[in-house]
Amino acid sequence: MNSNPSSRFSSSCLPARSSAIALIMLFACTLALASTPQGTFERTFQVSGPVNLEVQTRSGDITVRSGPAGTVSVRGKIFVGDHWLFGGDRRAGEVHAIEQNPPLRQQGDSIHIDDVNLHNISVDYEITVPAETAVRTHTGSGDQTIEGVDGNADLQSGSGDMRLSRLTGDIRIQTGSGNLRGHEISGPVHGGTGSGDVELEETGSGDVDLHTGSGNITARGLNGTFRGEAGSGDITAEGTQTGSWEIRTGSGNVRVRLPSNSAFEADLSTSSGTLDIDAPITMTVQGRVQESRKSIHGQVRGGGPVLKVHTGSGDIHIE
């Protein structure tokens, strides 16, 4: 009989250690399967005019990019969740059924992509469309990337990031949680996120309305009316005022950058913070500047569109 306590301890730990290793290996295999497509499909549709694209998914990423005229191409990647290991034959049959009969429909120049109503199965879509395409998407969870289309875009997600670039139509975006990024946008934009940052770069004219419950807002190249609201977070707005601007944040700093010759009606206030206006503008303010430096009301260079800024707790800087 082995009387060595350390030997008895090592021997008794072997089954537990083996079980732990097995669980780790099973978990690693599950992650590998979940991140690897279990199936794919591709379909091509011929169209003759401006396209209407509608995509609805329970979960999965959506990517839409512009391509040749007259053709819509759809590529799907099918993913299976952690139940793949415990129902392999049934899951394989479901994946095969989707590959053979994906949820795609064409009605004239309208392409519809419907939800896959199967538990723990999701599809990522990569879609190529003509530039003249209106896009409407709705996903429960998943990232969305939309690039290079000229039509209107109405994009919704329960959770996930949105990345937009080179769009020229009327854009409406909303995600429950996730970041929004828009670059080279030429047109009006309305929307926001419940939790996440919003970043927009405008290259054309259009009214912009952005909001976030928790996160920062950065909008550059503005040329129209602007409304920005954050529950908690900083807001930066840069551009040319061709209409009223209204900016509010409950907790955060606000920075506004306008052309040096801008004329506007100033209505600025902070409950707990400081106001700062660059010297060239300060010298031309007509009105009253409260001694407490908590609010400014008056005309800048004779007045113009209203610039209204309020922050509950944070500083305001106008340059």
Please place each PLM-identified region on the residue numbering.
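Intrinsically disordered, low-complexity terminal regions
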Residues: M1-E319
